[in-house]
């Protein structure tokens, strides 16, 4: 493995725990500690912990910070509070998704954008390019933050025992600042990428290992990127670089809820997104279940039963929960019909599949 890969503060911790390390977005990350299935099931039915410190953090501060983030992002950031985060997209002028991200309003003039690891530099440069007309400062503060995700049905009860705040009633994307966890000050966000209840913990980078080790003392399973991928795919959650790209809009990529083109404020890509909201997008993302043995991989062609190509698979795996072969695919809008049978070209075979809902959690 290349020595040029970036490492999170937990890299040596992974090695000591015998994790299998892979390259992901320029980082050396654990794909698994025990087995993907074991880690997947721990999160789906009990509790697991992920290191996601490779994610990027970009800070926007200054007098025009609120207007600037609204101009950059496709969702309506105007109603953000200092206790409610928002999932949104950074779009280009054609409405294509440069990145999907979560934005936190830390103060009236201070916003934290949490972006995908592989896109951090690209996003940062894009944001810098568009700041000229605004009185703002933009900083890449990724090297100041550690980020952990504790996920699963038992996560809330454990966190409630360990922090100095009551998290019982916290709802999706609510967050609290200045929470104490193992003596460290953290931002605690009710969010995740697994389809399960849980929290994302933002801490000073120097506190990452203390919190990681502290949580693992409570019979929490360490989990790698392999389980993170199968969990998000079962839940129908898109991955940027596969299901979302710069040539896919929020309406095509299945994240229409992250686009609000009817608001008064202008934002980059608004005209294209407004047209797609009113008239429909040419393509749409669907869930697929293969009806024959095989795995649908990214880029595999999707066809109607006559063999006409109507789209392609964007992500696919075998579900550890159900054992079924599941996928997300992008198809022509007019070809969509729930339950419809299609074909997927898997190597030299055409396998039958059917359109199902994107969230395929089966437990």
UniProtKB/Swiss-Prot annotation:
It comes from the Bacteria. It catalyses: N(6)-[(R)-S(8)-aminomethyldihydrolipoyl]-L-lysyl-[protein] + (6S)-5,6,7,8-tetrahydrofolate = N(6)-[(R)-dihydrolipoyl]-L-lysyl-[protein] + (6R)-5,10-methylene-5,6,7,8-tetrahydrofolate + NH4(+). The keyword Acyltransferase does not apply. GO terms for molecular function: aminomethyltransferase activity; transaminase activity. One of its GO terms (biological process) is glycine decarboxylation via glycine cleavage system. HAMAP family: GcvT. The glycine cleavage system catalyzes the degradation of glycine. This is Aminomethyltransferase. It comes from Staphylococcus aureus (strain NCTC 8325 / PS 47).
């Amino acid at each position: 493995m290349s020595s040029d890969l970036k490492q999170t503060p937990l890299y040596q911790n992974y090695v000591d725990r015998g994790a299998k390390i892979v390259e992901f977005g320029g980082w050396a990350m654990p794909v698994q500690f025990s087995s993907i299935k074991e880690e997947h099931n721990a999160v789906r039915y009990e509790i697991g912990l992920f290191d996601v410190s490779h994610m990027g953090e970009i800070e926007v501060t200054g007098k025009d910070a609120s207007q600037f983030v609204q101009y950059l992002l496709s969702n309506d950031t105007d109603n953000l509070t200092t206790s409610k985060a928002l999932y949104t997209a950074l779009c280009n002028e054609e409405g294509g998704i440069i990145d999907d991200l979560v934005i936190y309003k830390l103060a009236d003039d201070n916003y934290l954008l949490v972006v995908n690891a592989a896109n951090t530099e690209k996003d940062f440069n894009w944001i810098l390019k568009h700041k000229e007309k605004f009185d703002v400062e933009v900083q890449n503060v990724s090297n100041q933050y550690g980020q952990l995700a504790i996920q699963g049905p038992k996560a809330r009860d454990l966190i409630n025992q360990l922090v100095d705040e009551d998290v019982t009633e916290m709802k999706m994307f609510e967050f609290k600042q200045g929470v104490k966890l193992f003596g460290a000050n953290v931002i605690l966000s009710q969010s995740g990428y697994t389809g399960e209840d849980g929290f994302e913990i933002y801490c000073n980078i120097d506190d990452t290992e203390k919190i990681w080790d502290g949580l693992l003392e409570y019979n929490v399973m360490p989990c790698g990127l392999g389980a993170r991928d199968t969990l998000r795919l079962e839940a129908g959650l898109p991955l940027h670089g596969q299901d979302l790209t710069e040539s896919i809009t929020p309406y095509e990529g299945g994240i229409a809820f992250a686009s609000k083109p009817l608001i008064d404020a202008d934002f980059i890509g608004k005209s294209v997104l407004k047209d797609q909201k009113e008239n429909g997008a040419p393509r749409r993302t669907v869930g697929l279940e293969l009806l024959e043995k095989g795995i649908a991989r990214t880029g595999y062609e999707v066809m109607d039963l006559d063999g006409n190509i109507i789209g392609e698979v964007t992500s696919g795996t075998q579900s550890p929960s159900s054992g079924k072969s599941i996928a997300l695919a992008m198809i022509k809008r007019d070809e969509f019909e729930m339950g419809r049978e299609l074909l997927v070209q898997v190597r030299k075979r055409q396998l039958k599949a059917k359109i199902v809902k994107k969230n395929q959690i089966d437990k």
